[in-house]
Amino acid sequence: MGQIQYSEKYFDDTFEYRHVVLPPEVAKLLPKNRLLSENEWRAIGVQQSRGWVHYAVHRPEPHIMLFRRPLNYQQQQENQAQNMLVK
């Protein structure tokens, strides 16, 4: 069975992005014409930290999943957790 491949992260002014390349045997599990929820993409074996959203399908290559999350997402989560500990 092939391995799921993860790109390096890339950025714009608002989001950080990454793409995930699925092997054929996993790609065939993808539903047609819709995006996956976090629970769904985790269920097919995609592993990444919290906050990533499957935001687009690259029609010419549907085995490539496109993800994004807000810039500084992890830092915001750590700050919220720290604030809860202080209260």
Curated annotation (Swiss-Prot):
One GO BP annotation of this record: DNA endoreduplication
InterPro entries the UniProt entry points to: Cyclin-dep_kinase_reg-sub, Cyclin-dep_kinase_reg-sub_sf
GO CC terms, sorted: cytoplasm; peroxisome
Molecular function in Gene Ontology: cyclin-dependent protein serine/threonine kinase regulator activity
SUPFAM superfamilies: Cell cycle regulatory proteins
UniProt keyword annotation of Cell division present: yes
Gene3D superfamilies in the cross-refs: Cyclin-dependent kinase, regulatory subunit
Keywords from the named record: Cell cycle, Cell division
Family the UniProt entry places it in: Belongs to the CKS family.
Other comments on record: Plants overexpressing CKS1 show reduced leaf size and root growth rates resulting from an increase of the cell-cycle duration with an equal extension of both G1 and G2 phases and a shortening of the meristem.
Subunit organization: Interacts with CDKA-1. Interacts with CDKB1-1, CDKB1-2 and CDKB2-1. Interacts with CYCD2-1 and At4g14310.
Function: Associates with cyclin-dependent kinases (CDKs) and plays an essential role in the regulation of the cell cycle that affects plant growth rate. May inhibit both the G1/S and G2/M phases.
The protein, known as: Cyclin-dependent kinases regulatory subunit 1
Taxonomic source organism: Arabidopsis thaliana
